[in-house]
Amino acid sequence: MLDVVKGNLIVSCQALSDEPLHSSFIMGRMAIAAKQGGAAAIRAQGVNDINEIKEVTKLPIIGIIKRNYDDSEIYITPTMKEVDELLKTDCEMIALDATKRKRPNGENVKDLVDAIHAKGRLAMADISTLEEGIEAEKLGFDCVSTTLSGYTPYSKQSNSVDFELLEELVKTVKIPVICEGRINTPEELKKALDLGAYSAVVGGAITRPQQITKRFTDILK
């Protein structure tokens, strides 16, 4: 899968239960559109969406499950329960929060990575800082993504792409670095790849019409 996404675009097709497009059928159609536009892979949330997208596109999938727990701020594939659910799908890679925050039930991120690898799948580390990226490489993750920059209280807070973190990771770790988070234009995508990103994930700017519409209406205010 890593060979497939190298230098190419990954599109995140997600709509949570409180969003207008929440539907596995709709996400499948969105993924078909992304494929027709040239996406090399899809990042998808939830077993039903993953199964639907795999069926209709046959593209490689990065699977996640977003689930909230009372005893942790981590919600992207937080525990072994979510990993086990994802391993029952045909997703080629599983992404999980690899920040330094405490996991639900006191679980250990290394155990999750080992479980993913034991089933022959790849593991992506969603991180927010350089330190977390370095640790992710030590833990055996196959790639690292800037997904959570700005989403942890101790990481750089910004409304734009964290190109600084991307550059630091590219210089420091040997595993592929994926740029993800707040990429809103083709120019930002190209800049990420020019700075050394192995691949990049674009989500809301392509697949969330309410977010796209708001960018237009905000300019009128």
UniProtKB/Swiss-Prot annotation:
<dbReference type="InterPro" id="IPR013785">
    <property type="entry name" value="Aldolase_TIM"/>
</dbReference>
<dbReference type="Pfam" id="PF04131">
    <property type="entry name" value="NanE"/>
</dbReference>
<dbReference type="InterPro" id="IPR007260">
    <property type="entry name" value="NanE"/>
</dbReference>
<dbReference type="GO" id="GO:0005829">
    <property type="term" value="C:cytosol"/>
</dbReference>
<comment type="function">
    <text>Converts N-acetylmannosamine-6-phosphate (ManNAc-6-P) to N-acetylglucosamine-6-phosphate (GlcNAc-6-P).</text>
</comment>
<protein>
    <recommendedName>
        <fullName>Putative N-acetylmannosamine-6-phosphate 2-epimerase</fullName>
        <ecNumber>5.1.3.9</ecNumber>
    </recommendedName>
</protein>
<comment type="similarity">
    <text>Belongs to the NanE family.</text>
</comment>
<dbReference type="GO" id="GO:0019262">
    <property type="term" value="P:N-acetylneuraminate catabolic process"/>
</dbReference>
<comment type="pathway">
    <text>Amino-sugar metabolism; N-acetylneuraminate degradation; D-fructose 6-phosphate from N-acetylneuraminate: step 3/5.</text>
</comment>
<keyword id="KW-0119">Carbohydrate metabolism</keyword>
<dbReference type="InterPro" id="IPR011060">
    <property type="entry name" value="RibuloseP-bd_barrel"/>
</dbReference>
<dbReference type="GO" id="GO:0005975">
    <property type="term" value="P:carbohydrate metabolic process"/>
</dbReference>
<dbReference type="GO" id="GO:0006053">
    <property type="term" value="P:N-acetylmannosamine catabolic process"/>
</dbReference>
<dbReference type="GO" id="GO:0047465">
    <property type="term" value="F:N-acylglucosamine-6-phosphate 2-epimerase activity"/>
</dbReference>
<keyword id="KW-0413">Isomerase</keyword>
